[in-house]
Amino acid sequence: MLPALAILAAALCFSTTGTAQALAGVDASPLAVGAARIVVGGGILGLLALAQRSPGRARSGSRASTAALIAVGALGVLAYQPLFFLGTRENGVAIGTVVALGSAPIATGIVDAVRLRRAPTPRWMLATAVALIGVVLVSGVTGGATALAPGGLLASAGAGMSYALYTVCGKALIERGWNSTRVMGAVFGIAAVASLPVLVLAGTSWLLTPNGLALALWLGVVTTAIAYLLFGWGLARLSAVTVSTLTLAEPLAATLLGLFVLREHLTLVSGIGLALIAVGLAVVSAPSRRREEVPDATARA
């Protein structure tokens, strides 16, 4: 149960992103804010990884394949932010978010099934389907027909695939004997270095204001460094597909933060959506006869 709680805690950290930006009210582009988040948070994770002892020789896989997993994972981290923001710009925040979040567990299931040559369990499929219906209802995209930009839909789906890539690559590295903190540090540390020029080009003047600096630190420390330490710890002990479904707690928590912190209003449809997400999370988190937890060396460490 603790691994599932760790992932839910990570999702809670992720969910504060929108509320933090709303409260900060800084004049910065989403690309600049996203790059600052990766630079700060990825930098912290990278330093934590460097401070650890060498993981020793991997149990399987060549150095080249390990480097490829790290590179693909870092590429997933880098691609997620611009693809997500492009999707929301083209089709609106609600639709862009629901497509990105909704496609992430589906993409993870496909990528992980190809990697393991094994289909996800029926229970995972059911729990994910229920939670995804909840995400759609919470997003408010069910009311009326809307003309959608195909490019925006592809970008949002690409964001979901980017999430799947760094999740599955991280899981593969953990299975090779890497400590989860070192995995997150390697993937996000490389992404942080690559995000520096993006941040400079996107503009840094907002970081010189008190609210801007506070926002960058919150997003970097809480929604990235702490969140992905928890995420990695849970990923070492759960399957990638289970982790991807559990992170659907993010829109649930974000909606609740909007209600209690930003004084937003909850519609009946959104309330039903929250309940469905909770049901899906409960189903995927419940103990089963065949344990989801992964008894590898890094999980016991």
Question: Predicted segments — roles?
Answer:
Residues 45, 49, 120-142, 188-189, ...:
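Hydrophobic transmembrane alpha-helices of multi-pass small-molecule transport proteins
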Residues 32-43, 84-119, 124, 159, ...:
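Specific alpha-helical transmembrane segments that line the substrate/conduction pathway
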Residues 13, 18, 49-96, 100, ...:
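Specific transmembrane alpha-helical segments of multi-pass solute transporters/efflux pumps
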Residues 25-79, 103-111, 161-169, 184-202, ...:
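Transmembrane alpha-helices of multi-pass small-molecule transport proteins
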